Amino acid sequence: MINIRRMWQPLTATPFLATAAHHEILPCKSLQGWIRCFWGGIVGAGASPTRIIPDVCADLIYHIDETAGRIIQASFCGVSDVCGTAHLPMIPGHTVSTFAIRFHAFGAYAFADDALRGTLNGFESPEVRFGRLDRALRARLPELRGLSARTAYAQSVLLAFQCRENPLVETAADALLCHRGTATISEWAHELFISSRQLERLLGEYWGMTPKKGSALVRYQALYQEICHGTLTDVHDAVARYGFADQAHLCREFRRYHGENVSRFFKTSCENGRTMEENGVYPPEEVST
């Protein structure tokens, strides 16, 4: 069922925008089950803060001083369950760029050296849990120019890695996405032939979150994706499809993660669908295998 993970494409707060400061490149087919995209760009003078929403992803981010040819900041940002803003570093008189790998929440563990327990809403140095990958990336990123070249190199590094795959973790991800976060924890665990307590330990170690949190985030993102794609245009249909108690419950949950009222998005859902059909999501540049 790896195709379910390949088809799962979480959206950011600005799914219709591609700029010099932020562009996305999809990974090759072999990595799509674990990685959402590679992203980055040039940070311009006076760049405004970037709005962040929960996308059920974790990011390995490098900020590079192109003028001096060195990495000035690197971080691993765990899965987030809150909306907020991110400020990009700038150096007067220097050109600064960003390069990042956006892992699916259920995919980062495969390239990590250590468990991801405690990384929810976390911000730490990549060497803490991704030492091998961090060293390999630091060796070449500053000397490479442009997002495409850095993506090609990072992808070659990731493909050469001995991933620590866990079949039960992969099956858990398939089940979660198949139900789009609407199954109860006991139903989810039963489908995996384990107890709810075992599921909680499994996800805590490999995803850095509880089953309840994972379900809530996937349900929110699945709802947001359908609205943005224009495939869900009625709030009452959304209540029934995603198992909310009523419209008020849906609105509260959406505002909790998105920081805005969902009604505005439903009003523009048909227009959103046409926009995405015409432009795509950050019109991605597919990486050749």
Region locations from a protein language model:
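Alpha-helical bundle regulatory/interaction domains
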Residues: 1-173, 177-186, 192-196, 209-210, ...
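Long, low-complexity intrinsically disordered regions
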Residues: 186-189, 200-205, 212-215
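Residue-level "edge-of-site" marker
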Residues: 202, 217, 252, 268
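A secondary-structure capping/hinge motif
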Residues: 205-209, 254-263
